[in-house]
Amino acid sequence: MKAIKSILFLLVAALFVNVAMAETPKKGAKKAVTLAVDTKASKINWLAKKVTGQHEGTINLASGSLVANGMKVTGGEFVIDMKSIVCTDITDAEYNKKFIGHITTGDFFEVEKYPTSTFKITKVEGANITGDLTLHGVTKSVTFPAKVSMVGGKATATASIPVDRTDFGVKYGSKKFFDSIGDKAIDDVFNLNINLVAGK
């Protein structure tokens, strides 16, 4: 009988030890932290090309956050203010206003109807980031390489993201849809060059 009691005692003791070990965080384990994007310090530059040249400019982040676990970024969400589009290469004020008016209305991004675009990170593998980009009311998964640095609770990230506008229903001037457009064609793909700064 004493032997049975001893065995039961050992089993119960072992059970409590295992439960305690399971509930105790592993030494060195990292907790995920959310870093707020500094929208003033962060920059997004865009570049769009056509047969006869190209245009470039900036667009602002409205808000954003990065999720970091130790030295690695594991998630994040960002909101882009589509009404903040600026063209920096057209110096003539009247032509610049006309150009911005064109790309923000019906033929292109319809910013009154779609005032923001969003990007949500869904996967991070090595240097590659995958996420859901919502633009012009359409959501598509995109993958791109990024360089991320974590120093003293602050994160910086740079990336160049090619975006095919026709995937998001923006078809104006695309040879894919208008075969006879000739030298008035506008490239389907434009680039977003991103520099992010985020901290606690």
Model-derived features with residue positions:
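Low-complexity, acidic/polar, glycine-enriched regions of mature
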Residues: 21-200
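Bacterial Sec-dependent N-terminal signal peptides
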Residues: 1-26
